[in-house]
């Protein structure tokens, strides 16, 4: 019997630590076209900057004219840092990575701007009232940002806002995981040309026999339980074998052909990419796709989906990068 060790299976292979380090060491690339090409990012950042300049200028004038609450200066400085940080995150398209931290910072900023409004709006001095108006406008933008960054990608509003900039967005954060990174071993839905089939002997499969035979491979009583087990477990993994007679064994007469494993021909589902993904160069089964790209999907069970691109390229894609449409 010709058998292959489990080490040949891609499910048991461990990636090189150097390859993992190289993939994780890729930093996000800054591209301010992601802001210019996204109406939501452009409008909110522009509005927040105008509101900040209004509050800063009026606070300077109010401080020159007379007594001024020092707490308002802290709100001015804090919101400037928040606006710069959000601009960098949107420019690098890493909102799914830093979204939780951004919501926390914005919640604190909303508190500061609200207290600054309370300190300035009731004063009779016109410059202080104008400063309060600037803080009110910043608070409104902050509320919108909290809703955006705090919303999950599964909501209807987040993909809609992200789709506004689909024409000019570029994949900038290499292979970052927006949700869970604990995938573990995934099923091999496509067999690579350079990978031998995963097969085991009857001794290795002892205790895993099924009570009923696999369709198309009936066990024969004349050959005993061992040959029946071999027919059930080894036979289906070889696409080139169409007939296994009684007493047949895997040898030179029945060569294995791993490339003949059929791929799905029906893709009943359609999915939209909510993040860009670059396939692992060490795994020929994965496919790359860009944000907002539409893919045809054959199976939506599990963490990796068998997908087909518009160009006809097929492979597997991580399910947490896709949303069904």
Swiss-Prot record:
Which stretches are tagged as biased composition: Polar residues? 173-182
Q: Where in the cell is it found?
A: Cell membrane
| Pfam families cross-referenced by the UniProt entry | SH3_1
Q: Which residues lie on this side of the membrane: Cytoplasmic?
A: 1-40, 92-96, 151-325
InterPro entries to which the protein is assigned, alphabetical:
SH3-like_dom_sf (IPR036028), SH3_domain (IPR001452), Sho1_SH3 (IPR035522)
Location (main, coarse): membrane
Q: Does the keyword Cell membrane apply?
A: yes
Please provide the record's keywords in A-Z order.
Cell membrane, Membrane, SH3 domain, Stress response, Transmembrane, Transmembrane helix
Q: Which domain of life does this protein belong to?
A: Eukaryota
What is the protein's membrane topology class? Multi-pass membrane protein
What's one GO-annotated cellular component?
A: plasma membrane
State whether keyword ATP-binding applies.
no
The entry's function note states:
Plasma membrane osmosensor that activates the high osmolarity glycerol (HOG) MAPK signaling pathway in response to high osmolarity.
Please give the name of this protein: High osmolarity signaling protein SHO1
The species this protein was found in: Ajellomyces capsulatus (strain H143) (Darling's disease fungus)
Query: Where is the organism placed in the taxonomic lineage, from the top?
Result: Eukaryota, Fungi, Dikarya, Ascomycota, Pezizomycotina
């Amino acid at each position: 019997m010709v058998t292959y060790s489990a080490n040949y299976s891609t499910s048991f292979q461990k990636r090189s630590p150097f390859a993992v380090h190289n993939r994780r060491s890729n930093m996000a690339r800054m591209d301010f076209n992601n802001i210019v090409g996204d109406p939501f990012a452009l409008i909110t950042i522009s509005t927040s900057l105008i509101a900040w300049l209004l509050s800063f200028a009026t606070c300077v004038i109010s401080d020159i004219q007379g007594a001024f609450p020092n707490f308002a200066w802290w709100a001015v400085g804090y919101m400037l840092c928040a606006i710069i940080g959000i601009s960098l995150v949107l420019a690098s398209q890493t909102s799914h990575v830093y979204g939780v931290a951004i919501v926390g910072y914005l919640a604190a900023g909303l508190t500061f701007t609200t207290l600054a409004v309370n300190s300035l709006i009731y004063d009779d001095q016109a410059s202080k009232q104008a400063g309060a108006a600037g803080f009110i406008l910043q608070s409104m933008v902050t509320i919108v940002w909290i809703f955006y960054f705090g919303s999950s990608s599964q909501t209807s509003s987040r993909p809609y806002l992200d789709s506004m900039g689909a024409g000019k967005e570029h994949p900038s954060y290499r292979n970052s995981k927006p949700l869970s990174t604990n995938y573990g071993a995934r099923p091999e839905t496509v067999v690579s040309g350079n990978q031998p089939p995963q097969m085991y002997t009857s001794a290795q499969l002892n205790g895993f026999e099924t009570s009923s035979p696999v369709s198309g491979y009936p066990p024969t009583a004349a050959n005993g339980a061992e040959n029946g087990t071999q027919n059930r477990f080894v036979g289906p993994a070889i696409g080139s074998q169409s007939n296994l007679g009684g007493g047949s064994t895997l040898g030179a007469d029945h060569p294995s052909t791993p490339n003949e494993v059929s791929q799905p021909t029906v893709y009943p589902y359609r999915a939209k990419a909510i993040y860009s993904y670059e396939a692992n160069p060490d795994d020929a089964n994965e496919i790359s796709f860009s944000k907002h790209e539409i893919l045809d999907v054959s199976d939506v069970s599990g963490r990796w989906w068998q997908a087909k691109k518009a160009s006809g390229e097929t492979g597997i894609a991580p399910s947490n990068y896709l949303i069904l449409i």
